[in-house]
Amino acid sequence: KCCKKGGPRKCPPEGMTXFYERIFRI
């Protein structure tokens, strides 16, 4: 799930995926 769709290379912390999706638009 890391780097998917050209998103950030870092993996979001557990339970923070959605949070990262909103910020980085993964």
Swiss-Prot record:
Subcellular localization(s) per the UniProt record: Secreted
Tissue: Produced by the opercular gland in the gill cavity and secreted as part of the mucus cocoon.
Keyword field contains Nucleotidyltransferase: no
Post-translational modification comment from the UniProt entry: Glycosylated.
Keywords assigned by UniProt, alphabetized: Antibiotic, Antimicrobial, Glycoprotein, Secreted
Keyword Glycoprotein carried by entry: yes
Taxonomy, superkingdom: Eukaryota
Any Gene Ontology CC annotation: extracellular region
GO-annotated biological processes: defense response to bacterium
Its biological purpose: Exhibits antibacterial activity. May play a role in protection against parasite settlement.
Protein name: Mucus envelope protein
